[in-house]
Structure formats: structure tokens, C-alpha cells
């Protein structure tokens, strides 16, 4: 179902039932003054920021994830070039904040999670639970490629923990035999 949603042409965003992985086209007013820099790695593992902006569409406030930039591009004017009248993106439900990540440094605009309370403090607004992920051929920021591939690392984790258990058992047997 996710794959099918991502393959269809984007639909006009006005008065549509919002759902995860819905491809949309819309226009809106992007707020560049309250731009959020969310720490993240790009697809090759290089650290940088995802650029996230408040956007007003009709009477509703959303966040739009415009993509990834390297650290040196932070606060540069060239990352704010976008056609606000022709926005194509993918609607996705905002993920829950992780308690394992550091706290956001709102005063420095250095974010690790999109904590809704922190966003309210920073912007003064409440936003939809859906985030728009920009699609298109932009270079800075470079939009995140949304795929139907859902991460499944269970096999890797099982092998890792099984290997550790075997290693500990062998170490235990070695020292036990040595003592007798």
C-alpha cells in the first residue's frame, strides 16, 4: 500500500483526507525566520542538518522538511530558494521523540528531535501531526528520498546478540576449565 501511494501522481492538498505517504501538491507561505536545523546524517552517513520550516497552507500550520544540508550551509541565504506556489511533497506522520537523543538546543537552533513542546516554544505555533517531505530536484537542501522500504534489522540484531552470548559462554568455559 505504501509503494502504491508513492507511485501515484501528487493530488491537490485542499480538503483531502490526510494519510501517511500521501503525495501532494500545494502552495503555501514558508516561514524562513523560524527555520529549524535538525541534526541528521545523509544517505552516505555524512553529518549535517535537515532543514525544516513552518508553512501556512490555508488556515493550517504544517512543518515542511525541505531536505539535507552540510554544516557549512547553515544560515546561508541560498538554501532558502524555493517555489512556494508549486510545492510537491509526501505527507508523513511525525515520528515520536526519542528519549535516547540529547535535548534540543533551541537557543542555538540545534535540534536532535522534533519535540512538539520545543517547536511550540521556538515558533509560538502548534502544527499538524503530519510533516510534508519536499520532493523534487533541489540541490541545497537536497530532499530526502521517501521509499516504501521499511527498516528491518531484526536478523542483524539476533546474530549480534547470539554471537555475544556464544563468546561469553566460551570465555566462561575457558576460565572454568582453567580453575579446575
Segment roles from a protein language model:
Residues 1-15, 19-180:
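Surface-exposed, charge/polar-rich loops and edge strands
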